[in-house]
Amino acid sequence: MNLSFADTLYFKKENILEIILGLHRSYKSLQREIQICCELNNLTFNELIVILEIKKGIKKKIDIANKLFLKKQNLNLILKDLQLKNILKLDNKSILITQSGEELIQKTTDRINEKIIKIFKKTDPKNMSGFINIIESL
C-alpha cells in the first residue's frame, strides 16, 4: 500500500479553522479555493474570517477587531452585513451565530476541507515543511 503525505493527515474541525485563519496568506492555491467558497456562499473573505473567530468563541467586538487587525468601524460594517444576511444575531454585548449561519459555516468549512485535502494530495511532500510545522503546532 502506497500512502501519500495527504493520506496521513487527520484534519479535525478546529484545525481546519486554524488552517483557514493562518495559512490563507501564504498558500495561493488555498487562498483561491477559500475565495471561491466565499463567493459561492455570498460572503466576503473578511466576513468568513469574522464568523470563524466568533465560532471559535470570541464574542466581544474589540477582541475580534484586535485579533483580526480590523478597524472597529470596518468590523461594525461587517457585523451589520452579516446580521442583514441572517448569519449573526447581535445583542447588546454578545454576538451569536444563527442556525442558518451555523449551516453556512459548516457547508463552507466542509468544502474548504475537501479542497485542502485535494491540494495536499497534489503537492510534493518535500515542499510541505512549512505547512507541517504549522500543523504540528496546532
Please state what every model-predicted region is.
Residues M1-F11, K121, P125-L138:
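C-terminal regulatory/oligomerization modules of transcriptional regulators
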Residues R32-N74:
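N-terminal helix-turn-helix DNA-binding core of bacterial DNA-binding proteins
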Residues K80-N133:
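Charged, amphipathic alpha-helical coiled-coil/dimerization segments
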Residues M1-N41, N86-I87, S94-I97, E103:
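N-terminal leader segment of winged-helix/HTH proteins
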Residues E14, F45, F69-Q73, N92, ...:
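Residues at secondary-structure transition points
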Residues L52-K56, T109, E136:
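Short, locally clustered residues in the helix-turn-helix/winged-helix DNA-binding domain
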